[in-house]
Each structure stands twice: as structure tokens, then as C-alpha cells.
């Protein structure tokens, strides 16, 4: 009887430890995904402000319109993702647990109907299309906002 009780106690302790480790692992993945997305936006803004290559710089978010799963973020050089110079591409991939809840970029720029990208002007890093994207990782949600002046914030 004591052996059964000991095994049960060990199993309970193991289950509690596993739950704690699983929760910590999810928190780390959520923080990593947020940091990667912030890095993509700030890199594009900084490259534009420095005038690297004389190009506008942007970030294209590749996500499925149906499932909303964010597969990657590409920092690119060019007036748009479609017109970019692919030799400058820097791609960050995301785990399948990262989804785009909403993506709303507006402004005086020429809308392409593509709310998957933001482009920063050379030297000023002003954003012709600006707004926010809300991303969820498991149970955590973050809002990434780009101002008309190219400022990036994360909540």
C-alpha cells in the first residue's frame, strides 16, 4: 500500500512540474515571437532611415487569409513587396501557433489592397501606410503599431 501511495505522490509531483514547465515554455515562445516581429519592424525602419541602398524598406507579413497563421515576416528593400530587390530579403519564420488576429494598415499612400505590409520612406522612415497588426501566440496577444512617422510600439 505504501508503494502505491509513493508512486501516486511522485506521479502528482511530476504532473504539476510538467504543467509548470509547459506554461513556461509557452511564455518563452510567445516572448520570442514578439521580439522577432518587433525586430523585423525596427530593422526595416532603421534601414530606411539610414537610406541603405537608397531604397524604401518594408516588412511583409506572410499569413494565410483563412487560418490566419503567420508563417513568416520578410524585411525587404523596395517600394513594395512585389517590387522588392530580393537580394536584400531577410526572412523570419514563426511557429504555427502564431496567428494574425487583425491587420489594418491605412494612410495617404497608394493602397494596394494588401494589408500584409508596411513600407518606410528612405531617410525619414515615414510610413505611407500605417496602422497595427494584432498577433496571438496560444493565449497571449500583442498589438504592434506603426505610426505615420515610422515609430513602432508593442503592447
Question: Where do the protein language model's features map onto the residues?
Answer:
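N-terminal helix-rich module
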Residues: 7, 12-155
Amino acid at each position: 500500500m505504501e508503494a502505491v501511495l509513493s508512486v501516486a505522490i511522485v506521479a502528482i509531483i511530476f504532473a504539476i512540474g510538467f504543467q509548470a514547465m509547459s506554461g513556461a515554455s509557452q511564455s518563452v515562445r510567445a516572448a520570442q515571437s514578439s521580439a522577432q516581429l518587433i525586430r523585423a519592424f525596427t530593422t526595416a525602419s532603421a534601414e530606411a532611415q539610414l537610406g541603405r541602398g537608397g531604397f524604401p524598406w518594408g516588412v511583409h507579413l506572410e499569413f494565410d487569409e483563412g487560418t490566419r497563421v503567420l508563417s513568416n515576416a520578410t524585411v525587404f528593400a523596395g517600394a513594395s513587396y512585389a517590387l522588392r530587390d530580393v537580394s536584400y530579403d531577410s526572412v523570419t519564420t514563426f511557429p504555427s501557433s502564431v496567428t494574425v488576429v487583425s491587420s489594418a494598415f491605412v494612410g495617404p499612400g497608394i493602397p494596394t489592397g494588401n494589408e500584409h505590409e508596411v513600407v518606410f520612406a528612405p531617410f525619414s522612415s515615414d510610413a505611407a501606410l500605417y496602422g497595427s497588426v494584432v498577433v496571438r501566440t496560444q493565449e497571449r496577444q500583442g498589438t504592434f503599431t506603426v505610426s505615420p512617422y515610422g515609430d513602432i510600439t508593442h503592447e
